[in-house]
Structures are given as C-alpha cells and as structure tokens.
C-alpha cells in the first residue's frame, strides 16, 4: 500500500509540474511550449493471454505490455512506456483492459493508427478496441473506478474445446449448495494477503 501511495504522489507531482509549465508558456504553440508538451492517449485492449507471461514487461518471455509498447514505439518512431490499469498474470485474458501512453507527436488520425497497430497485434491474439486522447490528469491505474474479474469453471466429464484455456475444467460433480454457502463467507471486507503468490 505504501508503494502505491508513493507512486500516486509521484504522479500527482508530475501533473502539478505540467500545469506550472503550461502557465509559464504563454503561447502553447511556441517552440518552447511544444518541446515540453506530451500527448496522452488511453487505449482499451482485448487479448488472449494463453501464450504470454502476463501483462508486465519481463526480462525473459513475451508479455502483453512489452509487445504493445514495442509496436506503438515503432509506429510513432519514439520510445513510449505503456501504463496498465492492472497487472494480469500469466495465461489471463482481458476483454477491456485500460492502458495509457504519452508521446511527443500528436496522432492525427486515431482510427488509422489503431488499424495499423492491430495489423501487427491481431496475429498475436491482441486487439486494440478503442483509442482516446486524454488530459494529463488521467492515469490508467489511478483513474480506474472499478475492475471486474470473471472466473469460469467448466464442470463436465468431457474436455472443453471452444473454452480450452479459458476456464478451469473440473470432471467431478460440484456441490453447488455447499459452494454457495461457503461463498457467503467471502462477502465483506477481508484480508486475503496470505493467499498472494
């Protein structure tokens, strides 16, 4: 929690500095102002995480963040860093993961940019659903109001084909009555920190 607070304070300080810079530059179109100006964009991402080592960039292995960062950097011809709303683990899929990046050059045609990006990413089972220009007060992680996680159990003897790698296959019949009773114990404010990997 302290780590998250420090990140947030750092981010808030950055926003303050940007606003100060904005006020120092009386003409936002001047060369001085343009050299400080960064354009921020939010993207919504859908992906199948089966062949990835999760969201976050790692030294070894293919990650969602790493691949998208690399493709955006190539298209814009500048190094960018992608910030995600959350860090999903290995093999986890996403329907609408929010992320943002900053770049020096304004993207003139957003739909063309997404089309070019998806040309490469779709082969990797990643799709950019939407892109939107955002203000500097937006942050994919700290501006997120909610996160929804879905866990799928496929309870039958035969192996799933369509839902392969998209759910937990359990052969033995589950006792839903006991499961519902146990689920009630999870409702409310709880500390599940001991269950972390």
Predicted regions and their residues:
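Structured-RNA-binding interfaces characteristic of tRNA pseudouridine synthases
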Residues: 36-197
